[in-house]
C-alpha cells in the first residue's frame, strides 16, 4: 500500500475570517490537518495540495450561485500559511468540485505509485465528497479523516461521511 495525503481547498478564501466563501469549521480543523501533514511527511508519504482555482468571471460563480472565490493571483487563492506546501509537494489546481475532473491529480498520484488516499480539508459534502467519489471510481482506496474535514453545516458534513463509507466503500478514520 502506498498512501498519499490530500489537502483539499485549505485556501484563504475558505478558511480566513472574511474569506469570500468562508467555511465555518475550516479554521477549527486546521490544527488537525497540520498534524496530518507532519505525520505523512514523517512516514515518507506524498502530501498533495488540491486547490480550487478560478479565473475572474468564472461561469461557476453565476451557474452555481457562489460568490467569486479562489481567483488565481488573489490572496484568497493562497494555501493558508500554516499549511504552506513544501518544495516537493505537488499543488494541483482544480476548477470544479472534484480534484480529479480536468486536472492532473490522477497522473500525479500514479507517478508516485499511490493506491490509497487520505483526505483532509473542506468542504466535506462538496469538494471532499466529489474527490472521494472520483477516487473510488478510479480504483483508489479512500480514507477521510473525520476530524480533519469541515462542512458548511454539521448535518451535511455527517451525511457526506456516511456517503463515503456506505456508498463509496471508503473508511472514516481518525488519528493514526
Language-model segments: residues:
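Active-site-adjacent betaalpha module
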Residues: 1-4, 32-43, 67-176
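Acidic-leg catalytic submotif of subtilisin-like serine proteases
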Residues: 4-11
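Active-site flanking residues adjacent to catalytic metal/cofactor-binding acidic residues
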Residues: 8, 51, 146
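Short, glycine/acidic-enriched loop or turn micro-motifs at the edges of active sites
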Residues: 12, 16, 150
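Short catalytic helix/loop segments, enriched in acidic residues and glycine
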Residues: 23-35
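Metal-dependent catalytic neighborhoods of phosphoester/phosphodiester hydrolases
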Residues: 58-63
Amino acid at each position: 500500500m502506498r498512501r498519499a495525503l490530500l489537502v483539499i481547498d485549505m485556501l484563504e478564501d475558505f478558511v480566513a475570517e472574511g474569506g469570500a466563501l468562508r467555511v465555518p469549521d475550516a479554521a477549527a480543523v486546521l490544527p488537525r490537518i497540520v498534524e496530518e501533514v507532519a505525520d505523512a511527511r514523517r512516514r515518507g508519504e506524498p502530501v498533495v495540495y488540491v486547490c480550487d482555482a478560478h479565473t475572474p468571471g468564472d461561469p461557476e460563480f453565476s451557474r452555481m450561485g457562489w460568490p467569486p472565490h479562489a481567483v488565481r493571483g488573489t490572496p484568497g487563492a493562497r494555501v493558508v500559511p500554516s499549511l504552506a506546501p513544501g518544495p516537493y509537494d505537488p499543488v494541483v489546481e482544480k476548477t470544479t468540485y472534484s480534484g480529479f475532473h480536468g486536472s492532473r491529480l490522477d497522473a500525479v498520484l500514479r507517478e508516485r505509485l499511490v493506491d490509497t488516499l487520505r483526505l483532509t480539508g473542506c468542504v466535506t459534502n462538496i469538494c471532499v465528497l466529489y474527490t472521494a467519489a472520483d477516487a473510488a471510481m478510479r480504483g483508489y482506496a479512500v480514507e477521510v479523516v473525520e476530524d480533519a474535514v469541515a462542512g458548511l453545516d454539521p448535518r451535511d458534513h455527517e451525511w457526506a461521511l456516511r456517503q463515503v463509507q456506505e456508498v463509496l466503500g471508503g473508511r472514516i478514520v481518525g488519528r493514526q
